[in-house]
Amino acid sequence: MMHSGRVGQRFFLSLPLLTAVSLIAIPAQAEWYVAGQAGYSFAGPLRNVTTTGPFSGIELQDFDLNNSVAYGGKIGAYPFHGSLGFELDVNHSTPHVKSLGDSPGIHLAVTNVGANIVLRYPGVTFQPYLGAGPGIMIARLSRSAETQQDTQVSIGFNFLTGIRAFVTPKVALFTEYKYTGAKFGFHDAFGSFGGFDSTYRAHQLFLGVSYHF
């Protein structure tokens, strides 16, 4: 019998795919958009760092992360040009781990693939909006003096709010705030000694341009 946790994880991992299928199935009367975005990610430290593997259960100090540039893109739709929409949102940042005492820092890259439900005010010129949804968090830890190269995939969540302003009937500029949270498990980071679990949080600010059709 499959463990219920794995069933839940597979379900959430499939949500972006289900969102993509839903976007394809949206009626032709929908308002579609594609967008590019760039900004800055203010990552909090990796908290609740606990070892896994042969020496599991040891609590370590928080791993401070650097702020970094973030960039990505979106595709979404508002069925029947209404207030409720769906979007796929992908963004990438590099919140490298800062130096740990006498040890050098560790390169860390995070890709967030989000499937969001979005609610907007459908104004002609200005459209404030907010949204939320799960995200597939792909985090890659590079080889360093203290760690082995390791990649983890986990489920996180995204909350976003912003406002777009149409400069032409089809082109809009937007600014957006996004909050992201997830559990990261790098279980092979320390090689034969195991790895660690941790909690990731980030605040991100984006500027972007979208094309609506």
Region spans (language model):
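Cleavable N-terminal export/targeting peptides
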Residues: 1-31
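Short glycine/proline- and aromatic-enriched beta-strand/turn motifs that initiate or cap beta-hairpins
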Residues: 28-82, 204-213
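Repeated loop/turn-to-beta-strand initiation elements of outer-membrane beta-barrel proteins
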Residues: 32, 82-86, 125-126, 165-173
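Transmembrane beta-barrel strands of outer-membrane/channel proteins
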Residues: 36-40, 88-92, 130-136, 163, ...
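Outer-membrane beta-barrel translocator domains and adjoining extracellular loop/strand segments
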Residues: 46-55, 97-104, 140-148, 185-193
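Predominantly the C-terminal beta-signal and adjacent terminal strand-loop region
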Residues: 47, 59, 168-213
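Gram-negative (and chloroplast) outer-membrane scaffold detector with strong preference
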Residues: 71-144, 200-213
